[in-house]
């Protein structure tokens, strides 16, 4: 088997820092990569958090960790059991001093399942901290398990008005073979920026069925769904799609 034309690229729709590990893995497999952040992170004001009021903390992203670590003392965050979505997020949390509980979760949904198994049955709530829009909202699952929750928004995403020149050029020249999309929100924002570029030959590797549905509603022809956020899962799907 051979790879597609070496001039084609995989486009990762994510901030540069978070996208680099996947880029490095793909480059080692002779795949060209371009990273295209399509929004910026804007912290929002939130009231001081008394972590003693909660039995556990659920963190959805590295951005959440950075904001909490900046606005909360290390002593405070060490006292509450913390569950993170993904190993990369957990790595950042441990470095920042959070008291992370080890899990085998590979998605927001599987993490919610593990939290439900591990927490105690008491009157304290689960604190969910993250962005204004969550790729997966665990609150209904917790409610079904009779677990109370509190959600605090610490940042929002400001959409970019245009794609970068390099990204636009690759799309215009039909030199993008794969696009990596991590959330329904990212899919929606990207489709707004896509304009009249041809996508029929672009394979979208996306996280979750909600993201897939958004793409299919907008007539995206080639969509692969990844059910967890592990690097190797995304990389393997892209490598396979790049082979003929």
What are these regions (language model features)?
Residues 1-244:
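Signature of uroporphyrinogen-III synthase
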């Amino acid at each position: 088997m051979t790879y597609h034309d070496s001039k084609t690229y995989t486009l990762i729709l994510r901030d540069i820092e978070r996208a680099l590990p996947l880029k490095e893995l793909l480059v080692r497999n002779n795949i060209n990569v371009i990273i295209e952040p399509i929004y910026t992170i804007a912290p929002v004001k939130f009231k001081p958090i008394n972590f003693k009021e909660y039995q556990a903390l659920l963190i959805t992203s590295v951005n959440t960790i950075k904001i909490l670590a900046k606005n909360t003392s290390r002593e405070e965050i060490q006292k509450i059991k913390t569950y993170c979505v993904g190993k990369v997020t957990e790595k950042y949390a441990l470095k920042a001093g959070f008291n992370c509980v080890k899990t085998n979760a590979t998605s927001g949904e599987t993490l919610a399942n593990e939290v439900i198994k591990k927490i105690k049955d008491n009157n304290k709530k689960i604190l969910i901290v993250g962005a204004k829009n969550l790729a997966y909202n665990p609150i209904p699952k917790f409610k079904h398990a009779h677990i109370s929750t509190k959600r605090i928004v610490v940042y929002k995403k400001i959409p970019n008005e245009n794609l970068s020149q390099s990204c636009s050029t690759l799309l215009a020249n039909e030199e993008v073979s794969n696009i990596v999309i991590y959330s329904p929100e990212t899919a929606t924002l990207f489709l707004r920026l896509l304009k009249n570029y041809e996508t029929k030959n672009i394979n979208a590797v996306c996280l979750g069925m909600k993201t897939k549905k958004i793409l299919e509603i907008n007539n995206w022809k080639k969509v692969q769904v990844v059910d967890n956020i592990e690097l190797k899962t995304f990389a393997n799907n892209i490598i396979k799609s790049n082979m003929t």
